[in-house]
Each structure stands twice: as structure tokens, then as C-alpha cells.
Amino acid sequence: MKNLLYLKDEQIKEFIQLLFYAYRETFSDPKEVLSKKFFGPAHLRALNLIEGNPGINLGELIFKLKVTKQSLNRVLRDLIKSKMIKQIKDHNDTRKKNLFLDKEGKIFFETVYNTQKKRIFNALKNSSSDSVIKFKDVLKKIVNGR
């Protein structure tokens, strides 16, 4: 059996630090674009999830972001006021509101995405396809807690 050196504490600590730095750099790339709208990281996280899950309701968004309703309300108010997102009442349950990117939000998100895309694209382009597939698999396992 192989000696699993990558499972030693020092290696795991290094992976955690690298994940932190990768997150920090990727999410700081659009800082200038966000600041023009007076948005911050919380706005970006909400926009990312709404863009990737059109029609997500408030409860699902709270669950995915792992935040309180109170902390999310300010962010959503900002995004609605600036016409980035819109709320549409659910057809089956009118108490629920589904969230979508509005036209302005789609344009803004694309601008933000393009600032982040460069870093990710270059990293993927400079890696083998096998490495990319394995890395994606590891990330999914981290997200799913396996």
C-alpha cells in the first residue's frame, strides 16, 4: 500500500492554507468592480448563488450561504434597490419569493465573472486535463464532506 504522505497533518494544513489563498485571490479580483456599486464579498456570494440557481428562494439561499436571515436581508435589499436581482412570488406558494438576476444583474455578474475567470482559466489551461478532473473531484468531496 502506498505511503499516503498527503494525509499527514502538515500536508493537510498546507492544503487548507492554499484553499484560503485561492479563495482570497479569486474573490479579491473583482473588488474594484464591486466597490463601484458599494458592494462587498457578501453581495458577491449572493449574486453567485442566485446566478447559478435561478429561482432560488430565500430559505434555500440562507441554507446554501450558511447565514442568518437578518444578515442576508441587508444584502438582498441592496441588490434589489440597485436592480441587480428581482423577487417573483412562487406560483405554488405565494408566501415564497424566488430570486433571479435582473437585466442589470446579469450584466454586472458577467463583468465580475470575467475578472475572476482570468485567474481560473489560466490555472486550468496550465494544468493537465487529468489534474483538472482530479482537482474538481477533490473539491466536490470537500464541499460534500466526504
Predicted regions and their residues:
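N-terminal helix-turn-helix DNA-binding core of bacterial DNA-binding proteins
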Residues: S28-T68
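Short helix-capping/turn signature of helix-turn-helix
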Residues: I50-N53, N114, I142
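N-terminal leader segment of winged-helix/HTH proteins
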Residues: M1-K37, M84
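Charged, amphipathic alpha-helical coiled-coil/dimerization segments
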Residues: F27, R77-K136
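Residue-level marker of regulatory loop/turn positions in helix-turn-helix DNA-binding domains and
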Residues: Q11, F39, I50, L101, ...
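C-terminal regulatory/oligomerization modules of transcriptional regulators
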Residues: M1-K8, S129-R146
